[in-house]
Amino acid sequence: PLLINYVAFILFTAANGVVMRDAIKSFIDVGDNTAIILFGLVSFIIGFIGYELIHRLGAIMSALSGMIFLVVAVLALQNPLPVGAMDLNQGFALAAFALTVTQAASWTLGFGPYVADYSRYLPANISSKQTFWFSYLGNLLGAGLVMLLGAVLATMFTDVTSNPGNAIASFFGPWSKVAMVIVVLGVLEINSLNLYSAYMSAMTIFSGMRGMTRISRKVKFIAMGLSALAATLIAIATQYDFNAYFADILIAQVYFLVPWSAVNLADYYLVKKGKYVVEDMYCADGIYGKYNVSTMVIYLIGVASTVPFMDMSFYHSYFAKMIGADVSWVPALIVPAVLYV
């Protein structure tokens, strides 16, 4: 699961590089590949400096980005939507509904690794209930509102998915460059967070198995540098087929992250009921051990349960063809949870 987390962070880092390619080119006269490389390099520098810078930048960019998106929403909604866009009498389309639910589930459950990684930095007096609701509502509102805005912008711009920065900046006239800078900095922040998270996942694998208590800056530089390099190469390789690439990684999250989320939820709420020996989680010889064979088998069965429902650009399963969309998150959530309990 940690390896899957690592891969997911790398793939999203690559996706951000592609999305910001044209935004970088609007400031600097460079080619496509160079723009992606520059974006990856700056992301690496911020990520390497560390958590404190990422956290402070995130707080600032949350406020600035929120204002930018609010202004864009107000201006965009002043334009008429396409005829029939809000017509609820078109009939119910199961395929469209199932696809929307799957993508929403993938995005929401994919937020889990961020919560797990960074909730550990919270003060001890912050309750689990507070952590849950602030994380959930932040994810729901942050993603949901921006997705709704993206749907509106998609009716106005043909290239909004591949070049959202220019679409957003176009609303600000002579201030478009300022708006573009804010958009780029906002994506830089989450990109550096992705790289930092990938580094943490990679180091947790080795430190957990070897009982390491400290990671040197040299090791951090190498691990994060290799991660940034991998993400940049993937971005360069997929930049001209981005929509299929991003759709695949969004759906693929379901196959690998949801079964493990199901195991964690079942363990926390139904088996352990929130009672853990935290110190032993950091000890390879503790009561939890290095790994649990039966749990890993359950996880793999959970992954296997998604195969008959998979729907990707290169593979369409039987049930995906029948339903018209991927609903693999349902067995991915139910099967491992039932087996674990």
Walk through the language-model features, giving the residues of each:
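Helix-loop-helix connectors at the membrane interface of multi-pass transporters/channels
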Residues: 1, 16-34, 123, 194-225, ...
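Transmembrane helix-loop boundary segments of multi-pass membrane transporters
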Residues: 22-36, 52-61, 164-179, 185, ...
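Hydrophobic alpha-helical segments and their helix-loop junctions in multi-pass secondary transporters
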Residues: 30, 64-89, 104-109, 149-156, ...
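Membrane-interface loop-to-helix entry segments
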Residues: 34, 38-39, 43-76, 91-92, ...
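Hydrophobic, membrane-embedded alpha-helices of multi-pass small-molecule transporters
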Residues: 73-79, 89-153, 175-195, 288-306
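Loop-to-transmembrane helix boundary motifs in multi-pass membrane proteins
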Residues: 192, 205-240, 287-307
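C-terminal membrane-solvent junction of multi-pass transporters and transport-like membrane proteins
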Residues: 221, 260-337
